[in-house]
Amino acid sequence: MNPLIFTMILLTVMLGTAIVMTTSHWVMAWIGFEMNMLAIIPILMKKYNPRSMEASTKYFLTQATASMLLMLAIVINLTYSGQWSMTKPLNSTASIIMTLAMAMKLGLAPFHFWVPEVTQGVQLSSGLILLTWQKLAPMSILYQISPTINLDLLLLMSILSILVGGWGGLNQTQLRKILAYSSIAHMGWMTAIMVYNPTMALLNLAIYILLTTTTFVMLMVDSSTTTLSLSHMWNKMPLLTTAILTIMLSLGGLPPLSGFTPKWMIIQEMTKNDSMITPTIMAVMTLLNLYFYMRLTYSTSLTMFPSTNNMKVKWQFNNKKLTANLSPLIILSTLILPLSPMLALLE
């Protein structure tokens, strides 16, 4: 793709998200979602092949359906309240439909089926945008309508997402699918706390984006897309392999790494609101995520595969720019927990 055209498309994606996050008019929010959706499709098809075409089509159909539900919710709210403003409380029916639309855009269960398939069908760089930047706009809408969200519906989808995210990743060997199921589980944690403390949900989103970005950049350095290719990494880049071990354990939520911080805070906040059973179920189901990440780190870093000269040639083609950007990302992805006492300021 022409670099100038790619830059324009990328700017359009950012502009669409910025419109959704800053507007106070429902129609402008819908327009922002449409701009974002239409601009991201060429990015998903950057490497043109049948798999990327299929992934882009699945993404388009899912997002178009979600946009239709969003417009339906806007029209219902207009019928009852006569207001286009996002600052006014939503009608209960409109709130439920809008929650379902945002769940579809985020990939929450039971609307999660498109996430692994689309992520697997695109390049690593496109998958990074899909699993990080594309979560910002729907989360900002959920943040704005959080006072009127149906708590039971949101908690049901959250618990289902955590279960599906852990269960679906158990038998995967494709790294992009593993990260997609991990994304579904993380979205479940974020939406679970959205009604109780929306600010904490945004903090959780920021840490999730940081961890996922670090993981994708590491995989792009090595051009690894399967667990088998990742298992040969120790012979070429032992330091980077050690870093991948800690980042993946952080994504799984193992203390004292950064990924444990949001889970700890969410469980603490939910117990403060006299909710005991839900956080217990969520914590137990997260062990599934931790299990497949520990299995991945074992095969990557704790076992030595036979080394051949052909395997060692690949280091010459590493992207030096990506490697230079990894140091601050790795530090932040593993050492946020010591700063967590400062998070008391959120209360």
Swiss-Prot record:
Bilayer-crossing regions: 3-23, 25-45, 59-79, 96-116, 122-142, 149-169, 178-198, 201-221, 237-257, 274-294, 326-346
Catalytic activity as recorded in UniProt: a ubiquinone + NADH + 5 H(+)(in) = a ubiquinol + NAD(+) + 4 H(+)(out)
Keywords for this protein: Electron transport, Membrane, Mitochondrion, Mitochondrion inner membrane, NAD, Respiratory chain, Translocase, Transmembrane, Transmembrane helix, Transport, Ubiquinone
Entry's EC annotation: 7.1.1.2
Gene Ontology BP annotations: mitochondrial electron transport, NADH to ubiquinone; mitochondrial respiratory chain complex I assembly
Known function: Core subunit of the mitochondrial membrane respiratory chain NADH dehydrogenase (Complex I) which catalyzes electron transfer from NADH through the respiratory chain, using ubiquinone as an electron acceptor. Essential for the catalytic activity and assembly of complex I.
Subunit structure: Core subunit of respiratory chain NADH dehydrogenase (Complex I) which is composed of 45 different subunits. Interacts with TMEM242.
Family, per entry: Belongs to the complex I subunit 2 family.
Name of the molecule in the record: NADH-ubiquinone oxidoreductase chain 2
Provenance organism: Nyctimene aello
Gene symbol of the encoding locus: MT-ND2
